[in-house]
Every structure is written in structure tokens, then in C-alpha cells.
Amino acid sequence: MLLLERTKLVVEGAGAVGVAALRRAATVPAESGTTVVILSGGNIDTGVLADIARHHETERGRRLRVFTTIPDEPGSLAALLTRLGEGGANLIDIAHVREAVALSVGQTGVELVMETRGPDHTERILATLSEGGYSAKVLD
């Protein structure tokens, strides 16, 4: 992920061994001159790459998945989304869950996936939801 984030290069695991060795100090660069590390291979499944990126964002606190309930009436979803906007959340995906054992009559569930700026922003979003009367359960 380091190479992808910093250099925008897609390099398969074996092709990044030189960078890994330098980062772990397993190899010491020459005292004079320039050290060159060869990067090779971009043979990676794009679906796997997307999964890795999502996992990395979640791990770094830049992706938040929550489940909450809202009244099953017109305007409830709009009110929830307005609240999220006030918290600066960037909505990536939403699922409207109408049928679940845990839901009471007159309620509907909403699963939200949001992009955040980091752990502090995640906490602010959760606080904004709580202040708005929403009980949000963070999902893995």
C-alpha cells in the first residue's frame, strides 16, 4: 500500500521486496552515491486491489460502516443524510434494510458506508449521529 499511496504505482508483492528490505533496515544503502531499488510486476487482480484498498482505508480509520434505524416514514432518510452532511461525511454506499428480525414495526434499518478524513473525523461523525438521536452501530 505504501507504494500505491505515495507513488501511485501498482507493484506486486515480490516486485516490492527491495523497498521492504530498505524499510526494515535489512539492507543498508551505500554511504555515498544513489541507491536504486527496482520495482517490478503489476500483475494483480483489480478486484483484489480494490479489496486491499478498502481494507487499508478501514484500518486507517478513513472508511466507516454503520447501521442505524430510522422511522419508516417519508423524510426520515433525508433527515439522516442531512445530519451526516452536517458532520462532513462523504457517503459511498447506502442500503435500506426493511426486513430484519431486530427491527420493530414502523422502523427501517439503514447501513451506511462513508469515507472519512481519519479517526478523529470518524468520532465526530458518530457524535453528530448520536446528537441527532441516531443509535449507530459500527460494523467491521
What are these regions (language model features)?
Residues 1-33:
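Active-site-adjacent helical/loop segments in soluble small-molecule enzymes
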Residues 10, 36-38, 67, 93:
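Structured core elements
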Residues 13-15, 41-42, 75, 106:
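Glycine-centered flexibility sites
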Residues 15, 23, 42, 116, ...:
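A broadly conserved detector of short glycine/acidic/proline-rich loop/turn motifs that flank catalytic sites
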Residues 17-22, 45-46, 79:
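Short, electropositive, low-hydrophobicity segments enriched in small/polar residues
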Residues 23-54:
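Catalytic phosphate/nucleotide-handling subdomain of diverse soluble enzymes
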Residues 46-140:
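A conserved regulatory-domain signal marking ACT and ACT-like small-molecule sensing domains
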